């Protein structure tokens, strides 16, 4: 993905501390205090431009959402989208997924969303895939006992890798789809990439996974 650099992004993000949390480590274990109402907490890693995040937040107002994004220029677009929708149940973090343990406490998150992440197709880059064992270890620590991971991708190789990685890690699956848009899942909210790929007739792969006790 080619990113357009926006040198002003950092300054603009800092102007919205109530939406883009500037020192998220200070809220570790107390994220519900950042929202108007204490509700279940769903986290999207690699939130991109925020289309999925805002769509979910509108559809499920009784859930609090946090979008995590490492690229400031992309996060700026997400911030503008959340502001335009005036969503009280959304916060944004400028963080890398590898830093999640710094900002969330154990058993604090109810659900993780991983949507259309970089497939890192080369074998030597497997550890960078967000469904690799090193990231699953992080998610497991942060999820509540009945917490879930919802994963979507257009990349068949990454999907097969993720099924194997999660299965080897001892996870259980449900609602696995090899062609999401033919599955009749009514509550599906599409990402920017999902709209693009589905318009070309490409299948979207999806799964829900939980960690066994």
Swiss-Prot record:
Active site per the UniProt annotation: 118
A Pfam family annotated for this UniProt entry: Methyltransf_4
Pathway per the UniProt entry: tRNA modification; N(7)-methylguanine-tRNA biosynthesis
Keyword Methyltransferase: yes
Extent of the signal sequence: none
Binding site for substrate: 122, 154, 191-194
Main EC class the enzyme belongs to: transferase
MF term (GO), any: tRNA (guanine(46)-N7)-methyltransferase activity
Keywords, ordered alphabetically: Methyltransferase, S-adenosyl-L-methionine, Transferase, tRNA processing
InterPro entries: SAM-dependent_MTases_sf (IPR029063), tRNA_(Gua-N-7)_MeTrfase_Trmb (IPR003358), tRNA_methyltr_TrmB_bact (IPR055361)
Positions of S-adenosyl-L-methionine binding: 44, 69, 96, 118
Any one GO cellular component localisation term in the record: tRNA methyltransferase complex
Family: Belongs to the class I-like SAM-binding methyltransferase superfamily. TrmB family.
Protein name (Swiss-Prot/TrEMBL): tRNA (guanine-N(7)-)-methyltransferase
Organism: Shouchella clausii (strain KSM-K16)
Gene behind this protein: trmB
């Amino acid at each position: 993905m080619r990113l357009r650099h926006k040198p002003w992004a950092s300054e603009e993000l800092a102007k919205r501390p109530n939406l883009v949390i500037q020192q998220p480590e200070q809220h570790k274990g107390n994220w519900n205090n950042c929202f108007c109402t204490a509700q279940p907490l769903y986290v999207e890693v690699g939130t991109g431009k925020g289309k999925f995040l805002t769509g979910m937040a509108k559809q499920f107002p009784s859930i609090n959402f946090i979008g995590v994004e490492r690229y400031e220029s992309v996060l700026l677009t997400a911030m503008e989208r959340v502001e335009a929708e005036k969503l009280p149940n959304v916060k944004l973090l400028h963080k890398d997924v590898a830093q999640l343990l710094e900002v969330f406490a154990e058993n604090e998150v109810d659900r993780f969303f991983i949507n259309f992440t970089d497939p890192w197709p080369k074998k030597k880059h497997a550890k960078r895939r967000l469904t690799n064992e090193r990231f699953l270890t992080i998610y497991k620590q942060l999820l509540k006992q009945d917490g879930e991971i919802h994963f979507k991708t257009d990349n068949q190789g990454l999907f097969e890798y993720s099924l194997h990685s999660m299965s080897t890690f001892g996870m259980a699956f449900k609602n696995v789809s090899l062609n999401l848009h033919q599955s009749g899942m009514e509550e599906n909210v599409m990402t920017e990439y999902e709209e693009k790929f589905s318009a070309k007739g490409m299948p979207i792969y999806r799964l829900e996974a939980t960690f066994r006790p």
